Amino acid sequence: MKKSYRVKREKDFQAIFKLGQSMANRKFVIYHLKGEHKHFRAGISVGKKLGNAVTRNAVKRKIRHVLMELGDHLKTEDFVVIARRGAEELDYQAVKQNLHHVLKLAKLLEEGFEIEKKS
């Protein structure tokens, strides 16, 4: 993900947490706030309770990959994805389905967009 698509600064994270809205499912929480950018910006937070650094980085890589894949269909808002316990056990397809579900609940995806389900 390009740097311009990332939320990196602490004050940006805090603004999204304080002023934004949240939506959650069992594996992920999303806080989102309307931004003044031409594209979405995403921050990813994976707590130490999920496992060691290798495990946490693997979860972040999966989330980043899903966001890049869905990038053309995301609305221009700033958001933070927080991984909950159990997210470390998910394979890529499950991460994609769970993120799609919570992004849809938060109304951050374009209307009518659905992911293809593999059988």
UniProtKB/Swiss-Prot annotation:
Keywords: Endonuclease, Hydrolase, Nuclease, RNA-binding, tRNA processing. GO terms for molecular function: 3'-tRNA processing endoribonuclease activity; ribonuclease P activity; tRNA binding. Pfam families: Ribonuclease_P. It comes from the Bacteria. Coiled coil: none annotated. GO terms for cellular component: ribonuclease P complex. HAMAP family: RNase_P (MF_00227). Consists of a catalytic RNA component (M1 or rnpB) and a protein subunit. RNaseP catalyzes the removal of the 5'-leader sequence from pre-tRNA to produce the mature 5'-terminus. It can also cleave other RNA substrates such as 4.5S RNA. The protein component plays an auxiliary but essential role in vivo by binding to the 5'-leader sequence and broadening the substrate specificity of the ribozyme. This is Ribonuclease P protein component. It comes from Streptococcus equi subsp. zooepidemicus (strain MGCS10565). The lineage of its organism: Bacteria, Bacillati, Bacillota, Bacilli, Lactobacillales.
